[in-house]
Design a protein with these regions (language model features):
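Pyridoxal 5′-phosphate
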Residues: 1-297
């Protein structure tokens, strides 16, 4: 039996695939619009869902529907087992060291907001700086703008040339002792530029600056190894790679996640609650308040 790994998928994608055989796996692509087969090219925004994904969602609601992590009955145990099994698959898919480094969120946007609201608020102060690039998606601009406004910090932007490439010499000049984090796209959603992300990370790390990578467009199209990249945070979404909406991943180095405060309060992110004090849960659950998208996970 062939195992569905990133390398396996990458090799298969090199071979030409008949369009009709692809359509067969996607119910929505079997329909016609204006008398012609539907052609969908907006995968950078969201991908269509193959039948196997739709079947998995239906199977959860038909056979396992229950809350997770907080029940001892059969359905809760089955749902919890399936949900946590998927976390292990994500860990292996991006080669994280541990499932404790895989935080489930609603999408890339929430992952970036989580880091800005926790790591950012704790580490960025008046007069400090955050560095992003000129090709960022709004989701990797606005959270940092909001943080900088709140903290009276400065947002610096890596410029790019007419070919849509970041100017790395200018990038290096932006970094100094008051730079608290660099946040940059792995692949541009607008230009398709594949940034030299490993080099960008190495330059920042020489000055002890952590790096968040927006991988929303990269994970669906290329092999991502977070340990090889050396990134401190990596964010991506399920819905751009044939998965359901409302599911995303924040990878974070364990040593950084442990120092960050919770993002939201509620069920599942706690170990013990009294009216005097709350003891927060271990990683990654400290950042996963409330009932998640269990079916999507």
């Amino acid at each position: 039996m062939e195992v569905l790994t990133a390398t396996f998928v990458e090799e298969k994608l090199k071979a030409p695939v008949p369009v009709e055989s692809c359509r067969f796996h996607f119910p929505l692509l079997r329909r016609q619009v204006n008398g012609k087969p539907l052609v969908y090219l907006d995968n950078a925004a969201t991908s269509q869902k193959p039948q196997v994904v739709i079947d998995a969602l239906m199977r959860y609601y038909n056979e396992e529907n229950s809350n997770i992590h907080r029940g001892v009955h059969y359905l809760s145990e089955k749902a919890t087992e399936s949900y946590e099994s998927s976390r292990g698959k994500v860990q292996k898919f991006i080669n994280a060291r541990s499932t404790q480094e895989i935080v489930y969120v609603r999408g890339t946007t929430e992952a970036i907001n989580l880091v800005a609201a926790t790591f950012g608020r704790r580490n960025v102060n008046q007069g400090d700086e955050v560095v992003i690039s000129a090709m960022e998606h709004h989701s990797n601009i606005v959270p940092w703008q909001m943080l900088c406004e709140e903290k009276n910090a400065k947002l610096r932007v890596i410029p790019m040339n007419d070919a849509g490439e970041l100017l790395l010499d200018e990038y290096e000049k932006l970094l100094h002792e008051r730079t608290k984090i660099v946040a940059v796209a792995h692949i541009s959603n607008a230009l398709g530029t594949i940034n030299p992300i490993k080099r960008i990370i190495e330059v920042a790390h020489k000055q002890g600056i952590p790096v968040l990578v927006d991988g929303a467009q990269a994970v669906p199209h290329t092999k991502v190894d977070v340990q090889d990249l050396g990134c401190d945070f990596y964010a991506f979404s399920s819905h751009k790679m044939f998965g359901p909406t409302g599911v995303g991943v924040l990878y974070g180095k364990k040593e950084l996640l442990e120092k960050m405060p919770p993002y939201q309060g509620g069920g599942d992110m706690i170990k013990l609650v009294t009216f005097e004090k709350t003891l927060y849960n271990d990683l990654p659950y400290k950042f996963e308040a409330g009932t998640p998208n269990i079916a999507g996970g």
